[in-house]
């Protein structure tokens, strides 16, 4: 095809208009507008706002907790320390289940039910993150349609950033801040994959496992450890033609639980059916939860579990700081690449390479 037909004798009658340049899709005046800077609060302002129940300040404090910047971490740790005396007065419930079990929809219904009795609810929804990009869907809030607009509810979807089992590294600190802000009920939802349940179990008082009926072998793919952690198991979507399947699934789970030793709490986990979509069976689930708390507070296990969790997180924090200190050391960073290559080409064993790295690190500490 000829590039400029207007210059050819063959097309001498052809005229070409210059045309009109299309305007930019970006409003040029936006560049002139100054972005409003988010106000930076002092530690005392953070604490005062949180204790007074200011959700805006609470959200900013949680952002500081999740930040990887050292200056933000320093402020966050001070805020947490000062909020600690106001925490510990909530009911912490972990909610997990296979992907597609309807966790977010169920939390929407559960949350509205507990808020009818009074109090405030914080939902910490842990979204799956990509192991490659560390990106997160952060879509849980959109699936909690009614709860997300409730004045007494605070929903905080947090990216798991590839941490252990998909659980956000700073969830426990966020729980402390939410409790200090007056939220007396805390829900922690896990991604339902990997080892996330173990981490959540170590920061909640009651662990609720949501399962589905009518998916074939109901017990297939459920790890023994997760079953042992559950304080209650509920079968979702028990409605319509699925009711009988849900009852059968519940029977399978009850039989399986009989094979496990009695939990340290002395509580025998119950299995119930419900429909999150239609809101059926919700009352019975929360009667079970209330019964559990009455049981463990009476026999002293509630306080024992809280103390064990505090001890666990002390060791986890130590491990985390030691790990960060090691991997962020400039000398170690340089050595790691060389040692990794030595292991890959077979010139060194994994154990020798690791020992040399650790010996170097210990020498640097002297």
Task: Show the residue positions of the predicted features.
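Alpha-helical scaffold elements adjacent to nucleotide-binding pockets in ATP/GTP-utilizing enzyme cores
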Residues: 137, 174, 199, 203, ...
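Flexible active-site lid/hinge loop adjacent to a nucleotide/diphosphate
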Residues: 213-244
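Nucleotide-state-sensitive switch-loop elements of NTP-binding domains
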Residues: 42-96, 101, 105-196, 203-210, ...
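Long, well-ordered amphipathic alpha-helical subdomains in the mid-to-C-terminal portions
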Residues: 58-60, 273, 284-362
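Short hinge/gating elements
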Residues: 43-48, 101, 234-239, 270-275, ...
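Non-catalytic terminal/linker segments enriched in charged/polar, low-complexity residues
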Residues: 1-85, 333, 337, 354, ...
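Canonical P-loop GTPase G-domain recognition
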Residues: 232, 238-295
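Short beta-strand/turn micro-motifs at beta-sheet edges
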Residues: 142-143, 219-224, 259-263
């Amino acid at each position: 095809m000829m590039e400029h037909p207007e210059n050819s004798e063959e097309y001498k009658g052809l005229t070409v208009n210059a045309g009109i340049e299309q305007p930019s899709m970006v409003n040029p005046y936006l560049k002139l507008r100054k972005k409003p800077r988010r106000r930076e609060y002092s530690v005392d302002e953070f604490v005062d706002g949180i204790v007074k129940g200011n959700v805006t300040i609470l959200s900013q404090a949680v952002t500081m907790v999740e930040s990887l910047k050292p200056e933000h971490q320093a402020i966050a740790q001070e805020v947490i320390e000062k909020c600690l005396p106001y925490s510990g007065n909530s009911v912490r419930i972990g909610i997990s289940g296979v992907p597609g079990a309807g966790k977010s929809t169920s939390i929407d219904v559960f949350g509205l039910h507990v808020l009818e009795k009074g109090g405030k609810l914080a939902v910490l929804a842990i979204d799956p993150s990509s192991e490659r990009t560390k990106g997160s869907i952060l879509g849980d809030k959109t699936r909690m349609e009614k709860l997300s607009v409730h004045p007494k509810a605070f929903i905080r979807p947090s990216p798991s950033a590839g941490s252990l089992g998909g659980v956000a590294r700073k969830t426990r600190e966020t729980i402390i801040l939410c409790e200090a802000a007056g939220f007396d009920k805390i829900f922690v939802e896990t991604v339902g994959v990997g080892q996330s349940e173990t981490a959540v179990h170590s920061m909640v008082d009651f662990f609720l496992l949501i399962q589905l009926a009518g998916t074939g072998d109901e017990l297939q793919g459920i790890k023994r450890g997760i079953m042992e952690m559950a304080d209650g198991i509920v079968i979702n979507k028990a409605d319509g033609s699925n009711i009988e399947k849900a009852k059968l699934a519940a029977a399978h789970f009850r039989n399986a639980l009989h094979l496990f030793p009695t939990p340290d709490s002395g509580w025998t986990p119950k299995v119930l059916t419900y429909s999150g979509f239609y809101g059926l069976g919700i009352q019975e689930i929360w009667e079970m939860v209330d019964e559990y708390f009455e049981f463990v507070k009476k026999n002293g296990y509630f306080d024992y579990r809280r103390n064990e969790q505090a001890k666990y997180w002390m060791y986890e924090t130590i491990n985390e700081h030691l790990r960060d200190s090691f991997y962020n050391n400039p000398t170690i960073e340089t050595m790691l690449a060389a040692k990794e290559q030595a292991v890959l080409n077979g010139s060194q064993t994994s154990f020798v390479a690791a020992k040399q790295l650790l010996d170097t690190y210990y020498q640097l500490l002297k």
